[in-house]
């Protein structure tokens, strides 16, 4: 085909965690939208959301949202350096 080959995008939770951890080191409070600023694909958005849920569950962040379809705000409550790999890939 003249359009070339379409590659399947693989985004693992571990890879996304590395990105989010780095972001958390620089920002103590931010919106979910800010995590997606790098032109995220649908798969990347889903994986980012799953990592955020895992970080909530482990107590490293708190999340608040005023209402349905409102912005999601994230506050870092733990030390990002202490976050270990997510093995749920």
Regions found by a protein language model. Give the residues of each.
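A charged, low-hydrophobicity C-terminal interaction/regulatory region common to genome-maintenance complexes
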Residues: 1-89
């Amino acid at each position: 085909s003249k359009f070339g080959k379409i590659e399947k995008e693989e985004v693992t939770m571990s890879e996304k965690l590395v990105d989010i951890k780095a972001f958390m080191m620089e920002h103590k409070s931010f919106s979910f939208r800010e995590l997606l600023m790098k032109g995220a694909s649908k798969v990347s958005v889903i994986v980012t959301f799953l990592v955020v849920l895992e970080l909530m569950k482990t107590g490293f962040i708190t999340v608040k949202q005023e209402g349905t379809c409102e912005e999601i705000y994230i506050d870092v409550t733990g030390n990002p350096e202490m976050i270990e790999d997510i093995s749920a890939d």
